């Protein structure tokens, strides 16, 4: 791999720390000296400094860029802050670097927006920018799920990256998921699909609560184990080597219900992805990777751990928050009620049609929300 001398990271929310394995891949034992992270405020500053090996400072991005002359700038602030950071910090630094003959850093931007083309429009055609949407799967119960979920990588049309720097960008992505290189528009509906599938967490909450109300000691992990096994049954296989499911941890009577809901949720999301123009083979590939990885997460984690993970990933106003908001408003109550009715012998097969339609509708809503976010740039 091409040598990386220095990395500057703008933003220290969850993603800034989550990328630590990537910094280590690029820099090895030089992370402490050659990764510089800049926060917007001093909130939790000392806590973060104690937790991470790299230097963390506040509000001095331009100064750090001038000092470090990085090979890579990682952009992971809230999307709304990006235009100001580009105007007040990146534009002057890139202009100074050009005038001094200093090589321009590659820009790795994280989040659904902006399109990498926005950076080219603001900074000039001689830059190199790539957008990352990592799978965000985590290590749960000692099982490393990171590389099994779908990660999306977006280069600009024409892809001006030199081959060695392009490969470095891909290698960085591969650490955090199974990489799919797709255009910006496709990345928005791929991300919407993943975040709709993320509501598998909330499905497990609703079914677990319904069973608990009926006197069954059934955790979200038990529900996840059954859904994972049932998913693999109707898909004809899966990554059993990564995480095993089980049909024996829930009351046998709930299995037909879980089978119907799991299959409906998978199909509703897939139908939406294909409806907006995605080639079905590609859609099945990345959707299946995310769906199974999320079911593995539900199977391996406690409810508290799932809720903590969601709190870390659900950016205020973002696509994950939107998926959960719509699910909770429109389907959580009906799903709990249907699970109870099924156990009492009263569920209609039509409920699964409703579930499939709801998955489609949530995906559509989240996709449109992603476009509204993109429209701000």
Region locations from a protein language model:
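Rossmann-like NAD(P)(H) cofactor-binding subdomain of soluble oxidoreductases
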Residues: 19, 52, 57-169
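Internal alpha-helical scaffold of NAD(P)-dependent oxidoreductase catalytic cores
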Residues: 51, 118-127, 145-301
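Non-catalytic structural scaffold of enzyme domains
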Residues: 7, 15-21, 44-47, 60, ...
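NAD(P)+-binding Rossmann beta1-loop-alpha1 motif at the extreme N-terminus of oxidoreductases
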Residues: 1-72, 175, 209-215, 274-275
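NAD(P)-dependent Rossmann-like dehydrogenase/reductase catalytic/cofactor-binding core
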Residues: 1-5, 33, 224-253, 260-377
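Glycine-rich beta-alpha junction loops
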Residues: 41, 112-114, 133-138, 186-188, ...
């Amino acid at each position: 791999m091409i040598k990386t001398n220095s990395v500057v990271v703008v933003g220290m929310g969850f993603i800034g720390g989550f990328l630590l394995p990537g910094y280590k891949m690029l820099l090895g034992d030089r992370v402490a000296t050659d990764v510089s992270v800049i926060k917007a405020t001093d909130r939790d500053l000392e806590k973060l400094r104690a937790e991470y090996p790299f230097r963390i400072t506040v509000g001095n991005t331009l100064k750090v860029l001038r000092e470090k002359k990085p090979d890579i700038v990682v952009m992971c602030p809230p999307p709304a802050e990006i235009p100001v950071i580009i105007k007040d910090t990146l534009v002057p630094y890139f202009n100074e670097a050009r005038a001094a003959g200093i090589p321009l850093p590659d820009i790795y931007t994280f989040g659904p927006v902006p399109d990498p083309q926005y950076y080219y429009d603001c900074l000039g055609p001689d830059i190199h920018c790539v957008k990352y949407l990592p799978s965000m799967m985590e290590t749960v119960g000692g099982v490393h799920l990171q590389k099994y979920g779908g990660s999306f990588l977006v280069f600009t049309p024409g892809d001006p990256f030199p081959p060695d720097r392009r490969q470095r960008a891909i290698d960085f992505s591969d650490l955090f998921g199974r990489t799919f290189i797709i255009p910006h528009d496709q990345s928005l509906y791929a991300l919407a699909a993943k975040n709709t599938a993320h509501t598998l967490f909330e499905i497990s909450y609703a079914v677990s609560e319904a069973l608990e109300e009926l006197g069954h000691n059934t955790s979200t992990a038990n529900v996840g184990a059954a859904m994972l096994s049932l998913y693999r049954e109707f898909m004809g296989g899966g990554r059993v080597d990564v995480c095993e499911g089980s049909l024996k941890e829930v009351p046998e009577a709930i299995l037909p219900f879980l089978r119907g809901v799991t299959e409906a949720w998978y199909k509703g999301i897939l139908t939406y992805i294909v409806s907006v123009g995605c080639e079905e083979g590609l859609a099945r590939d990345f959707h299946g990777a995310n769906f199974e990885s999320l079911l593995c997460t539900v199977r391996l984690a406690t409810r508290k751990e799932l809720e903590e993970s969601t709190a870390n990933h659900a950016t205020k106003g973002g696509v994950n928050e939107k998926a959960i908001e719509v699910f909770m408003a429109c389907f959580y109550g009906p799903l709990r009620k249907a699970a109870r009715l099924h156990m009492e012998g009263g569920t209609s097969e039509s409920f699964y049609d409703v579930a499939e339609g709801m998955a489609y509708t949530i995906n559509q809503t989240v996709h449109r929300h992603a476009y509204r976010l993109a429209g701000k740039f």
